[in-house]
Each structure stands twice: as C-alpha cells, then as structure tokens.
Curated annotation (Swiss-Prot):
Gene3D superfamilies: 1.50.10.10. It is found in: Secreted. GO terms for cellular component: extracellular region. The keyword Signal applies. It comes from Oryza sativa subsp. japonica (Rice). Keywords: Carbohydrate metabolism, Cell wall biogenesis/degradation, Cellulose degradation, Glycosidase, Hydrolase, Polysaccharide degradation, Secreted, Signal. This is Endoglucanase 7. GO terms for molecular function: cellulase activity. The active site is at D89, H430, D482, E491. Ubiquitous. Belongs to the glycosyl hydrolase 9 (cellulase E) family. Its EC number is 3.2.1.4.
Length: 531
C-alpha cells in the first residue's frame, strides 16, 4: 500500500509540473486554485435555456425569460418556431446554431458518462433536442433548408427583449437554385452527431435525425455553393469565409461515425486533397473553420484502427495536419513561420483574434482534450511537431485543462469569464434580454429604441444574470472591460459554451479522482516524513 501511495504522489507531482508548463510563464505566476467543475457544468447548461426561442416548456429553469418568436416562419407558410438565439440579439442564424449542437453532441459522445455522473444528463439532452427539433422543422424538403430567421441589420438597430420584438422575422432558405453546402453540411453533422447521443434513450428519434442528416448531406454535396452567396443578409454576421468543403468533410465523418457505412469514409479519403482536408494546416477551430475538427476526427479513426488498410495513407496525412493544430496550440511548430503557432497572452490564454477570442479558447480546449484521449488509446501515442519535437498525451491534456481554468478565473485578473461562476464575473454582458427588466416582472412594452434609451447605457449590472454564458473575453494582454458597449469582449455566444459542457464534465471526474488519490497519498507522505 505504501509503495502504491508513493507512486501516486509522484504522479501528482508530475501532473502539477505539466500544468505549470502548459500554462506558460505568465500563467505559472498566476495563483492556481481548485475549481468546482461540477458547478461550472450545471451553470453552462442553464445558459442554453436563456437562449431559447419559441414557446418555453413548463420545466424552464431560467425564469426571467418568456415565450418569443411565436410567429417565426408564418409569412413563408412554414413553422420555424423554436431554436436558439446565437448571442445577445434575436436573429436565428442556422450555421452557428448547428455548430453549437454538433459540439454539444460531441461533448456527450466523448464525456456523456461524466455528464450523467454529475446528474446533468437530462439537461444536456434537452439542450441538444431543443436545437434538433428546430432543424427537423427547418428541413422542410429533401433539398430545402431554412437557414435564417430575422434580419441582422434591423435587429441590431433595436435594443429590446425577445418577448417585445418588433423587428423583421423574415425567413431565408437554401435550396437547389440557391445552394448552401456549408449550412446544410453543418446541420447534417449536427443531426448525425445527435443521433448517436439519442441512440440508447430514444432510438426512434435517433433514426429520424439520421434520416434528415443523410438527406441534408446529399443536398449539400449535390448542389454546391456557399450559403452567404444565396443569403446576402448573413454576410455581415456569419460569412462563410472558409467555404463549404470543410463542412462536407465534417458531415461525412459524422455520418460515418453514426452509421459505420464505408462510403462516407471513402468520401473523406477521396476528397482529402481537393477539399483541403490534408492540405490546410490550421491553428483555429470555429463555427466557420472546421478543418482542425475534421483532421482530429480522421486521426481518431487511424489511432483506433477503425479503417480499412486502403485508407491508412490518407488518414496518416490527416493525422499530420491534426498534430499541426495541436502543436500550434502547444507552441511547438518549429517550421512554418509566425502563423504556425497560436499566440499566448502573458497569462497563458490562447489568443487568435480580438473579437470573441473565447470561442477559440473553448473549442481548442475540447479538441486538445479529445485528441489526448485518442492518443491515450495508442500504445505509442505521442504528437509529432514540425521541427522534430514531440509531446505526450499528458502534456496535451494539461494545456486543455489550463485553458479551462483560465476561463474559470485562473488568470491575471482573477475573473471568471463563465458568467455566474465564482465571486467575480462580468456583470454587464452585451445581451438584450439579460440587460432589461424581465418580461414576467414588467410586461409594459419596450419599443425598439427604448431599450437603448433606458437600459443599454446604464452603468449598473444587468438585472438578469446570464448564468453559464462565456463572454468574448480579454485581449492579447489579458485586459478586459466589463461594459455593455464593448461587444467584442462582453457578448456571449452559444458556441463558446457548447464545447465546455464536455470539458467541465471530464474535469469534474478528473478532479474527483485526484481528490481520491490525494486521500491515499496523504498517509504515505506522513509515513515518509517520519522515516
């Protein structure tokens, strides 16, 4: 027993050293503390209830919200009630909504047992289903998908509660004449991934989702084009800069995982070069740019041996690009110039760009954690970086955890960027509903510009706490201004929080295991001190 305990002590010391290394010099100087990942998990799932559009259910826990968008799609003769508002406004953008659901589903696929152990399985499934129920409505024909409800220009002119909306609820679709392979591909990915999640608890629903996913993928692949070329109104808000080829690969990989059918993997292998899957060396992962996610999913098939021998060579190329992303986050790519590695703030935060940088942090944390787990399944699991350096699974996992801890308050400002968590967090989130008196408390109509006049410019905290939201976060120097007008830093988005559902669940399990190990190790330290 004593020998086992001493080994555990050594393992804990090694883990602490890896965490210090992963956080960088600035983060090492920041005081580290234990975080309540279970509390963070519970709060993160509450956020999705605050973002609901449509008729709210009786078990709605975010009491300051009420029904909204109840006539969405009416002018077009289609029922588009439901879904999620993406951020602090009231447009329903299909591409980021679908990516949110994909990442929620991936969280559950990898760490669903951990979510269930924390007692949050039901809430997580509800969060996914609120999105997929909407996608079923929006996919009205095999080759037709409603991709947006509302207009960003008129919406941003007003500052209203969603319950008071007077802005346009025009709906926009993609179809054979106006293709949108990116939004259709991402929605296919979301529904395929969600079908895996619901396979045990609701097999009929899982089959329905898979049916829609397969139809949407066929539509996206057969009628190719960027959705922002078909829907001009989306260009100023969610332009598809990366194009649609990454979404086609992404959707095919999720359909392969959901069905096990070889032709989906053949598609990923056959189009690896021409679609950029084995060509693009990427250092970001987001609602727009899916290549790193594609490469990591493809590498998983290689690491776990879930492929035919004829696929090996191409999957090895995918793995090389996946490890470029991982090494870029670690700062280990010796070749490729300044853009080959992700910048770090003095406090250790991965920094990609000024506007809503936290989306890149949270998505990176998830990809790193998942890849570390995939590496752990391989006897020779290690990351090979450009220039000859290597990194083990433990180091990759430690960086993922360091990014999560930064979000939760282990940073130079000591602020949690997860709203409602800890003693210090943003109080003036750029969010219309949260910043105005709740509709249930005051049903007096608030007009389009009244919100700007009476609520937007207030220096006081928001009357409603947007629990579980992850705001845009600090700049490259770890600086942050908690001001409603500072939308680049204080606006939260659903796709910021979605990957953290899985991360909080995983880290909650790890923290529990560490406490158990510490309890075993403590007597051994005492015994060693007496020798």
């Amino acid at each position: 027993m004593r020998g086992r305990a001493l080994v555990l002590v050594a393992a804990l010391l090694l883990q602490l050293l890896l965490l210090a290394a992963a956080g960088g010099a600035g983060a090492a100087a920041t005081e580290r503390k234990a975080h309540n990942y279970e509390d963070a998990l519970r709060k993160s799932l509450l956020y999705f209830e605050a973002q609901r559009s449509g008729r709210l259910p009786h078990n709605q826990r975010v009491a300051w919200r009420d029904h909204s968008g109840l006539t969405d799609g009416l002018e077009q003769g289609v029922d588009l009630v439901g879904g999620y508002y993406d951020a602090g406004d009231h447009v329903k953008f299909g591409l980021p909504m679908a990516f949110t659901v994909t990442m929620l589903s991936w969280s559950m696929i990898e760490y669903g047992d951990d979510v269930e152990a924390a007692g949050e399985l039901g809430h997580a499934l509800e969060a996914i289903k609120w999105g997929t129920d909407y996608f079923i409505k929006a996919h009205t024909k095999p080759n037709e998908l409603w991709a947006e409800v509302g207009d960003g220009d008129t919406d941003h002119y007003c500052w209203q509660r969603p319950e008071d909306m007077t802005t346009s609820r025009q709906a926009y679709k993609v179809d054979r004449e106006r293709p949108g392979s990116d939004v259709a591909g991402e929605t296919a990915a979301a529904m395929a991934a969600a079908s895996i999640v619901f396979r045990k608890s609701n097999p009929h629903y899982a089959s329905l989702l898979l049916h829609h996913a397969q139809q949407l993928f066929e539509f996206a692949d057969k009628y190719r084009g960027k959705y922002d070329s078909s829907i001009a109104e989306v260009k100023s808000y969610y332009a598809s800069v990366s194009g649609y080829k990454d979404e086609l690969l992404w959707a095919a990989l999720w359909l392969h995982r959901a069905t096990g059918k070889a032709h989906y993997l053949d598609y990923v292998v056959d189009n690896a070069d021409c679609f950029g899957g084995t060509g693009w060396a990427i250092t970001e992962f987001s609602w727009d740019v899916k290549y790193a996610g594609v490469q990591i999913l493809a590498a998983r098939l290689l690491l776990r041996g879930e492929h035919e021998e004829r696929h090996r060579s191409t999957l090895e190329q995918y793995r090389a690009k996946a490890e470029h992303y991982v090494c870029g986050c670690l700062g280990r790519n010796a070749d490729g110039g300044a853009d080959a590695n992700v910048e770090r703030s003095p406090g250790g935060m991965l920094y990609v760009r000024q506007w809503n940088n936290m989306q890149y942090v949270t998505n990176a944390a998830f990809l790193l954690a998942a890849y570390a787990d995939y590496l752990g399944d391989d006897a020779d699991g290690a990351v090979s970086c450009a220039g000859g350096e290597t990194a083990g699974a433990g180091e990759v996992a430690a960086l993922a955890r360091a990014q999560v801890d930064y979000v939760l308050g282990t940073n130079p400002r000591g602020i949690s960027y997860l709203v409602g968590y800890g003693a210090k967090y943003p109080n003036r989130v750029h969010h219309r509903a949260a910043s105005i008196v709740p509709y249930k408390h005051s049903k007096e109509f608030i007009g389009c510009t009244q919100g700007f006049d009476h609520w937007f410019g207030r220096r006081s905290s928001n009357p409603n706490v947007l629990v579980g939201a992850i705001v845009g976060g600090p700049d490259r120097r770890d600086r942050f201004r908690d001001n409603r007008e500072n939308y680049m830093q204080t606006e939260a988005c659903t796709y910021n929080t979605a990957p953290m559902v899985g991360m909080f669940a995983k880290l909650n399990r790890m923290a529990r295991q560490e406490r158990e190990q510490e309890e075993v190790a403590a007597p051994a330290r005492s015994t060693a001190a007496d020798v």
